[in-house]
Amino acid sequence: MDHSLVYVTTSDRKESKRIAESLVGERLAACANIFPIKSVYRWKEKIVEEEEDAMIIKTRAELVDKVIERIRGLRSYEVPDIISLRIEKGHARFLKWIDESTE
């Protein structure tokens, strides 16, 4: 099976935990890492600097569309910052664990 990482930013820890618990609980993801970040970006012609959370979500490639759709339903941002990256290589037992942890 192929595997992917999904990267997403959220407004705060509460939103991150809600997304992580939903994805893992629904077996769409094996794991979600949450960490604090500072983002600088352009929004409506202004430069904005904000404290946010970033998430790295581990899943099977075939589930990425479902993961993205689920995140969109839980996110508060107008323009969701959601991307996926294919895992080219990884520890075989870890990748097997992703398979076993998702449906």
What are these model-derived regions, one by one?
Residues M1-E103:
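Positively charged, small/polar-rich N-terminal and surface patches that mediate targeting and assembly
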